[in-house]
Every structure is written in structure tokens, then in C-alpha cells.
């Protein structure tokens, strides 16, 4: 996404007007084809992400922190393999005794220096100071977060000390918040209330 910001600025600042070629090649990016997309938590959401990554040609591997049995269609890996092989690692797991603090300094140290880390699960799965250290020391390439340990973000959040801000993208817990998703949630809650009171 940071690349999109670069290209948008490039065009809107008038620099594209002066290009000699129809395409701007100076800022590179890569396809998902041939990359390994690791998923921590292959539940309903993780499986949808796996399906999409697979459609774009990525090899998908996953790790189940709870030790759940293998999911058909995708390669189950141990945690070390997930960390070492993933070009992109996305978290979709719930917070529980198996996942709290799982992504710590030791875990980030095992990842590729070119890896992108995404947390779309729960904030406390990540030791935030360890992620900041991994970004600042180049142990991973970039991170995208939709969840934090404390929400809204604290004024003294360690994420504010990331040296290269372009390597970290944070959204305010909105991955779930599409209008349609909220409408579905309200219908589910209404149905559960009716069931409880036998209405």
C-alpha cells in the first residue's frame, strides 16, 4: 500500500508529466506469483485469505498454534518453518494461551529480511516493542497492522518510534468494519437474543 501512495504522489505532483516512458520503473514491486504466503490461524478468515493468495499464484502454508488438525488444501507447517519460509506472514488467529505474545523478538529474528508481516488477528499476539525493533534493525522489510495491544493507540505507543515510517502501515481496527459486515453482526446478535428468550 505504501507503494500506491508513492505512485499517487508521483502523478499528482506532476512528475509523471515529464516521464519519457509510459510506465514509471524506478520504484519496483513484485508479484505474489511464486512467493510463500504464511498464515497463522487458518480459520474462516484465514482460509479466505489463503484462497485469494493461492489464486494469485502464491504458495500457501499455515500454522495452527492450538495444534488443530490439518486443513485440506493447504500445507501445514511448524512454527519455525512458517517464520523462515514466509515472504508474507499474516495473522488471523484468535487471542488465547497459545497465541498471546507468540510473535516476539525470537520469532521476528527467524523471518526473512525481505518479509512483510501483517496482523489482522488480535493485538496482543504481537510483542509490539519487538516488532518495532525488528523494523528498525531491518530484520523484516515491513509490517501492516489493523489491531494493536491497546485500542485506540496510546500516545506513548512504541510504533511511534519506528524510524522509517514507510515500513509500517497501521489502520484503526477497520478490517472487520464494512457496512455489510456490521449489518450481518447485528442480525446474528438479534437472532441470538431471540433464541435466548425463545421469541
Regions picked out by a protein language model, each given a short descriptive name:
Residues 1-9, 35, 52-58, 190-195:
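Oxidoreductase and adenylate-handling cofactor-binding alpha/beta cores
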Residues 1-36:
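Phosphate-binding beta-alpha-beta segment of Rossmann-like dinucleotide-binding domains, i.e.
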Residues 16, 102-103, 153, 159:
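Short clusters of hydrophobic/aromatic residues that line enzyme substrate/ligand-binding pockets
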Residues 23-113:
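Rossmann-like dinucleotide/phosphate-binding beta-alpha-beta segment
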Residues 15, 36, 41, 87, ...:
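Conserved functional loop/turn residues at catalytic and ligand-binding sites
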Amino acid at each position: 500500500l505504501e507503494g500506491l501512495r508513492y505512485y499517487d504522489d508521483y502523478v499528482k505532483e506532476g512528475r509523471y508529466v515529464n516521464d519519457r516512458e509510459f510506465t514509471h520503473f524506478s520504484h519496483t514491486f513484485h508479484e505474489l506469483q511464486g512467493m510463500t504466503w504464511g498464515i497463522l490461524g487458518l480459520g474462516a478468515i484465514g482460509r479466505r485469505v489463503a484462497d485469494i493468495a493461492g489464486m494469485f499464484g502464491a504458495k500457501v502454508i499455515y500454522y495452527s498454534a492450538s495444534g488443530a488438525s490439518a486443513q485440506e488444501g493447504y500445507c501445514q507447517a511448524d512454527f519455525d518453518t512458517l517464520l523462515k519460509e514466509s515472504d508474507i506472514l499474516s495473522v488471523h488467529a484468535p487471542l488465547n494461551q497459545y497465541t498471546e505474545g507468540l510473535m516476539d523478538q525470537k520469532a521476528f529474528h527467524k523471518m526473512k529480511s525481505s518479509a512483510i508481516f501483517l496482523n489482522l488477528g488480535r493485538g496482543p499476539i504481537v510483542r509490539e516493542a519487538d516488532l518495532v525493533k525488528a523494523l528498525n534493525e531491518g530484520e523484516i522489510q515491513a509490517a501492516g497492522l489493523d489491531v494493536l495491544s491497546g485500542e485506540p493507540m496510546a500516545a506513548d505507543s512504541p510504533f511511534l518510534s519506528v524510524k522509517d515510517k514507510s515500513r509500517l502501515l497501521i489502520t484503526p481496527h477497520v478490517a472487520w468494519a464494512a457496512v455489510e459486515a456490521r449489518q450481518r453482526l447485528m442480525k446474528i446478535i438479534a437472532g441470538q437474543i431471540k433464541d435466548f428468550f425463545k421469541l
